[in-house]
């Protein structure tokens, strides 16, 4: 297996399995973490709470990087009708509010939406997708377009919005309980007490990941925490990791296939939406989540509050 050593993997090691020098760096940066935590806490106060008349559910996490928010949002959309996803649209090359999908019709380009939003747009059970830096405007637009439920991707820190907060608890904990840059936490760890439900893998949901072995495939991925795909590394001839949200270039992928005498790219769906027009033969790594009764019933109870 060949691995491309890059900044993304260095960060993964720094936050979750640091060596001696990375631990030293974390302590050197600790004063910056204290400042970061202070301003992060300050930002959660002094804003009027905004209340909506329909269910708003947030799926988020405290730590840096991916913890499975996208598969969990998809799982909620499979369980409940009329779900619209609202997200910031990280790394998109556009500003403001864009309706990416409405009632199963895709209305904008990948450049305008960003990779995560476009991945949602291809999910049949999701009725609409909206990107907006201002989540309140995004929620308002979703309900205007007929959403029954709005699911916010990565909005735990938006405490000015009254919502049902699901906080994903990762199986792999950050090495230090510090905020950025000394640790992986975006908010101090005690903020988890503000969640309505802390979802733990195995107890509240089950994660499925599947792809067939293919010796003629190169695995290429640009997701956070690529080692989540560890069990699949041996299923391809070679593996390459790129920075989260990386914009693939056709020529570089062609060169990787030629280098290893392969004819197929092994990708997550988030990666696939960025290369689908390149004409490559692709094999998708299926990443799914199934809700367990503990989480499903909590969401049902919350939704029923709006039916009274």
UniProtKB/Swiss-Prot annotation:
Enzyme Commission numbers on file: 2.7.1.130
Binding residue positions for ATP: 63-70
GO biological processes: lipid A biosynthetic process; lipopolysaccharide core region biosynthetic process
Leader sequence residues: none
Catalytic activity: a lipid A disaccharide + ATP = a lipid IVA + ADP + H(+)
InterPro entries linked to this entry: LpxK
PANTHER family, A to Z: TETRAACYLDISACCHARIDE 4'-KINASE, TETRAACYLDISACCHARIDE 4'-KINASE, MITOCHONDRIAL-RELATED
Functional note: Transfers the gamma-phosphate of ATP to the 4'-position of a tetraacyldisaccharide 1-phosphate intermediate (termed DS-1-P) to form tetraacyldisaccharide 1,4'-bis-phosphate (lipid IVA).
Protein name listed in UniProt: Tetraacyldisaccharide 4'-kinase
Naturally occurring in which organism (per UniProt): Campylobacter jejuni (strain RM1221)
